[in-house]
Curated annotation (Swiss-Prot):
Annotated TM spans: 540-560
Naturally occurring in which organism (per UniProt): Homo sapiens
Gene it is expressed from: EPHB4
Main EC class the enzyme belongs to: transferase
The name this protein goes by in its record: Ephrin type-B receptor 4
SMART domains assigned: EPH_lbd (SM00615), Ephrin_rec_like (SM01411), FN3 (SM00060), SAM (SM00454), TyrKc (SM00219)
Length: 987
């Protein structure tokens, strides 16, 4: 069966070719357009092909043409009929230049193919211009087989066949053009066609004939007749550009209830009479279960025979059953006011295992009428839903006759009509049992005991032998909470009670005839004892004192250990010192996935494979180097549904691209830290290949900061930097070098937690490049603004080069996403760094933070702080917020000369709006205009109160605008030199 399905798949998956033009089938002149109209141009001739059929051909042989001369041949307008990529198969012969006696240096053995798109047949003999633009070059075609021309003999040689690919096409049609620049050749035939995926039925899913418009096109399928979609995503398959269907469907369909798959899983067949299929799925039709039948084809359920039923909770495929017969051999044992009944199971259980029992009771007074039993009787464990064949009845009245009817029930008893069979038993109680005990009183109460007394009941005959006391705490439920006490006198003492608790008490008496019924519940309460409370307080005070002494001892021990640690060395504090970093015993070390002989083995070892049915893609949120980035949801069995980010691998990938795409997962899967993006798993067993990570609601840090410019306090920004440093400290301890640490590669969640990401690029330096940049494996260039100088010059990447990049990230955060080095070119950045220039402090940046940046930018990489020292320094700032109030001043005692980005003179701006956009406050342009601040003269007089009235409520934005206004005032003073005339940085 599987072989048959496989063969069916192979035959149906063949690509279809739709012909647009085939000159071998043309019988009349082609009349294609040539240019120029001179001797030696393309000439249309009639000839015979290999099968001796008449065909139209074009020949050209101008081997002594003037330099720059070209002969063009253009086909008629060809409608593309929905095709995006068109294939052109050329059959041609070409003479070898050496065999031509008159061939000059201009003789060639190649020709060029072009195409031109248009929405209608508008081309003329002169338009479009006969040149590469507007014509689009397809390829320069060289002959694989050359024909040799010997003197006095006919030319001999093989026919060349070449297939070219045109596109992508977007207009209604196109022309194909051939350019000859000195070849001697004959164009024997031209076949223009496009490929499409044939109609396909597989896995009970029908996919329509499809013309591919991309490398890989998803095609939605529809279920065949009497089939329904399987759980999960809608059925889909991928149509490749070459007209082949790619792999098996993502999901498929399954036959509806009452139908089974047939003919190689391509259609659904109705179940025959006497068979059924209860659910949709891959199963086949089954014979009807016991006591049921189906009289029609396509049955999803078999009907029960007369007298048989299915319970509502029974599956459709369950046998039909019947109610049980009556229980047998009921035996009664009477003990005063209590009765024990037990019986045997019925002869017929009805074919079910959910057998239960129930009792009905009637009581008859002496010489009186009968009625259903009252509520004073108790049944243990209950009057119905009994699993075991016994019950104890308590509270029987003396000298009463009781009739009990015991019935057996199962899951279909409620569906049956007619009387329910039962087994009766009659019991008459004695008249000598004592009556119920009442009038219970409390004679003494303490915190842990109650003393009770009651009146002696009058027994009809004989004396009371003893009493049974039943009591439990009020509110307590269940048999385990009830306690019993026997006493021979009409009093009792209940001990071991809770202080201040309420108890419910009942008493019954026993004579020679047995126990009488329990009387009414009596409510009693124990007392609260203050002396006992004082003792507890004393114990609490003593316990607290002991705990205090223990804490003092612990503090002393910790202090001694800290002093010893300080005496051994003080390099744990942040300083300029450097030393060798050693990985402690048991520390996990990063393993490069490319060291594996099979990189897929690294993916299997470090990343969890996720079933694609657990993944739901909701929307595309971006595009990455390898494909799209989406937001989706992950719902694994037994786990809570979570929001995830999904990276997909675009279609048409190579195996190398697939390995590099999945390498990020095998890297990420080795990390587990709250400030490192968490890998959820990978999908590699279906298309498209996916990497799933936790979803970070606020996206990349740089764009998030620019969007919220001025809305965070310094302490909040330092907290973000501390999280990034903590993640980098973890990576350094794992011996992993990031190489591309930048704010764009830091993700932020809804709680403002920053996490390091982007572990997927394998980077290398471009050779012989005048502007050194890092290039990814797929060609994406990475700016050098974040890269340490030794990494640029010597390709030396270490944790120290990551520390340099971290300093740039600090500058990005404190400037709310400003571009490092502004608009300077890469070469200018390199030159400035070589001359020891460094970035200045961002506006309102604390001095301590800018000094930490400068330490990270030390030219000697050994002098840069390591990440544990960076974390320690940031922790000190967070613990001492006052240190963050000292704001850095430009060139104020800096150890390096600082770059300067001067603001242009305000006269360089054409309007107030242009000025606002230049200082990145363009969001308030309309507010300024509405408030009447339309000139620089008015803006120069603006105050903080005016800004509030306009709607500038953020303190950071107010500072930025007022600082620029102050700068504007200084520029307007007489004798003050103007700005630089532009935003170009100076150093």
């Amino acid at each position: 069966m599987e072989l048959r399905v496989l063969l069916c798949w192979a035959s149906l998956a063949a690509a279809l070719e739709e012909t647009l033009l085939n000159t071998k089938l043309e019988t009349a002149d082609l009349k294609w357009v040539t240019f120029p109209q001179v001797d030696g141009q393309w000439e249309e001739l009639s000839g015979l092909d290999e099968e001796q059929h008449s065909v139209r051909t074009y020949e050209v042989c101008d081997v002594q043409r003037a330099p720059g001369q070209a002969h063009w041949l253009r086909t008629g307008w060809v409608p593309r009929r929905g095709a995006v990529h068109v294939y052109a198969t050329l059959r041609f012969t070409m003479l070898e230049c050496l065999s031509l006696p008159r061939a000059g240096r201009s003789c060639k053995e190649t020709f060029t193919v072009f195409y031109y798109e248009s929405d209608a047949d508008t081309a003329t003999a002169l338009t479009p211009a006969w040149m590469e633009n507007p014509y689009i070059k397809v390829d320069t075609v060289a002959a694989e087989h050359l024909t040799r021309k010997r003197p006095g003999a006919e030319a001999t040689g093989k026919v060349n066949v070449k297939t070219l690919r045109l596109g992508p096409l977007s207009k209604a049609g196109f022309y194909l053009a051939f350019q000859d620049q000195g070849a001697c050749m004959a164009l024997l035939s031209l076949h223009l066609f496009y490929k499409k995926c044939a109609q396909l039925t597989v896995n009970l899913t029908r996919f329509p004939e499809t013309v591919p418009r991309e490398l890989v096109v998803p095609v939605a399928g529809s279920c065949v007749v009497d089939a329904v979609p399987a759980p999960g995503p809608s059925p889909s398959l991928y149509c490749r550009e070459d007209g082949q269907w790619a792999e098996q469907p993502v999901t498929g369909c399954s036959c509806a209830p009452g139908f089974e798959a047939a003919e190689g899983n391509t259609k659904c067949r109705a179940c025959a009479q006497g068979t059924f299929k209860p659910l949709s799925g891959e199963g086949s039709c089954q014979p009807c279960p016991a006591n049921s039948h189906s009289n029609t084809i396509g049955s999803a359920v078999c009907q029960c025979r007369v007298g048989y039923f299915r319970a509502r909770t029974d599956p459709r495929g369950a046998p039909c059953t019947t109610p049980p017969s009556a229980p047998r051999s009921v035996v009664s044992r009477l003990n005063g006011s209590s009765l024990h009944l037990e019986w045997s199971a019925p002869l017929e259980s009805g074919g079910r295992e959910d057998l239960t029992y129930a009792l009905r009771c009637r009581e008859c007074r002496p010489g009186g009428s009968c009625a259903p039993c009252g509520g004073d009787l108790t049944f243990d464990p209950g009057p119905r839903d009994l699993v075991e064949p016994w019950v104890v009845v308590r509270g029987l009245r003396p000298d009463f006759t009781y009739t009990f009817e015991v019935t057996a029930l199962n899951g279909v008893s409620s569906l049956a009509t007619g009387p329910v069979p039962f087994e009766p038993v009659n019991v008459t109680t004695d008249r000598e049992v004592p009556p119920a005990v009442s009038d219970i009183r409390v004679t003494r109460s303490s915190p842990s005991s109650l003393s009770l007394a009651w009146a002696v009941p009058r027994a009809p005959s004989g004396a009371v032998l003893d009493y049974e006391v039943k009591y439990h705490e009020k509110g307590a439920e269940g048999p385990s909470s009830v306690r019993f006490l026997k006493t021979s006198e009409n009093r009792a003492e209940l001990r071991g009670l809770k202080r201040g608790a309420s108890y419910l008490v009942q008493v019954r008496a026993r004579s020679e005839a047995g126990y009488g019924p329990f009387g009414q519940e009596h409510h009693s309460q124990t007392q609260l004892d203050e002396s006992e409370g004082w003792r507890e307080q004393l114990a609490l005070i003593a316990g607290t004192a002991v705990v205090g002494v223990v804490l003092v001892l612990v503090v002393i021990v910790v202090a001694v250990l800290c002093l010893r640690k300080q005496s051994n060395g003080r390099e744990a504090e942040y300083s300029d010192k450097h030393g060798q970093y050693l990985i402690g015993h048991g520390t996990k070390v990063y393993i490069d996935p490319f060291t594996y002989e099979d990189p897929n083995e690294a993916v299997r070892e470090f990343a969890k494979e996720i079933d694609v049915s657990y993944v739901k893609i909701e929307e595309v949120i971006g595009a990455g180097e390898f494909g799209e980035v989406c937001r989706g949801r992950l719902k694994a069995p037994g786990k809570k549904e979570s929001c995830v980010a999904i990276k997909t691998l675009k279609g048409g990938y190579t195996e190398r691209q697939r390995r590099e795409f999945l390498s990020e997962a095998s890297i990420m899967g080795q990390f587990e830290h709250p400030n490192i993006i968490r890998l959820e798993g990978v999908v590699t067993n279906s298309m498209p290949v996916m990497i799933l990570t936790e979803f970070m609601e606020n996206g990349a840090l740089d764009s998030f900061l620019r969007l919220n410019d001025g809305q965070f306090t310094v302490i909040q920004l330092v907290g973000m930097l501390r999280g990034i440093a903590s993640g980098m400290r973890y990576l350094a301890e794992m011996s992993y070098v990031h190489r591309d640490l930048a704010a764009r590669n830091i993700l932020v969640n809804s709680n403002l937690v920053c996490k390091v990401s982007d572990f997927g690029l394998s980077r290398f330096l471009e050779e012989n490049s005048s502007d050194p940049t890092y290039t990814s494996s797929l060609g994406g260039k990475i700016p050098i603004r974040w890269t340490a100088p030794e990494a640029i010059a010597f390709r030396k990447f270490t944790s120290a080069s990551d520390a340099w990049s971290y300093g740039i990230v600090m500058w990005e955060v404190m400037s709310f996403g400003e571009r490092p080095y502004w608009d300077m070119s890469n070469q200018d950045v390199i030159n400035a760094i070589e001359q020891d220039y460094r970035l200045p402090p961002p506006p309102d940046c604390p001095t301590s933070l800018h000094q930490l940046m400068l330490d990270c930018w030390q030219k000697d990489r050994n002098a840069r702080p390591r990440f544990p020292q960076v974390v320690s320094a940031l922790d000190k700032m967070i613990r001492n917020p006052a240190s963050l109030k000292i704001v850095a001043r430009e060139n104020g005692g800096a150890s390096h000369p600082l770059l300067d980005q001067r603001q242009p003179h305000y006269s360089a701006f054409g309007s107030v709006g242009e000025w606002l956009r230049a200082i990145k406050m363009g969001r308030y342009e309309e507010s300024f205009a509405a408030a009447g601040f339309g000139s620089f003269e008015l803006v120069s007089q603006i105050s903080a109160e005016d800004l509030l009235r306009i709607g500038v409520t953020l303190a950071g934005h107010q500072k930025k605008i007022l600082a620029s206004v102050q700068h504007m005032k200084s520029q307007a003073k007489p004798g003050t030199p103007g700005g630089t005339g532009g935003p170009a940085p100076q150093y």
